[in-house]
Amino acid sequence: MQSSTVQGVEQLLKEFLGEVPVGVSNRHVHLSKEHLAILFGEGAELTPKKMLSQTGQFAAEETVTIEGPKRSIANVRILGPVRGQTQVEISRTDAFALGIDAPVRDSGSLEGTPGIKIIGPKGSITIDEGVIIAQRHIHMDEAAAERFGVKDKDIVSVVVDGPRA
C-alpha cells in the first residue's frame, strides 16, 4: 500500500508530464518493395488497415505466413510503409515455436540474425537474415520526448498500473 505522499507525488507528475499510452506490438513483418512484389504480385501496394502511433506508419490489411524449421505461423500482419530491408519481429514464444534462435535487437539491427521463409498469396521468399525479438522501446513524438526530458536511445523506466504491476 502506497503512502499518501507517494500517491500525491505520482499525481503531480501525471498532471505535469502527462501519461504515455502503452501497447504491446504483436508479431509482424516489414517488407521491402521487392519482396512485397514477389509475395503479392507486381505493382502491389499495402492497404492501410489501422494507423499506428508512429507518424505515417500503419498496420496493413495484408498478412503473410512465416515458416521456420519446426512450424509455421499464419496471418502475420505486415506493417507499412515498405522498408529498405525485410525484417520479421516475433516474440520469444514465437521463436521457440518456429524453431529459430532469434536475438533481442533494436528494429533494423539485423546483421547476423537468422532468416525465415515468408509466404504470400502470389509467391514466397526466404530471407537469409532479419528475424529479431524486438528490444523493449518507446515510440513518442518530439514534443513528448522534450516534456519527459529524453532523447533517442535513452534508457528509461516505465511504471504501469494493473494486476501484474
Where in the sequence are the language-model features?
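Short, low-complexity, charged amphipathic interaction modules
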Residues: 1-17
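Short beta-strand-centered segments at strand-helix junctions
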Residues: 21-69, 74-121, 126-159
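Short, intrinsically disordered, charge-balanced linker/junction segments flanking boundaries
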Residues: 163-165
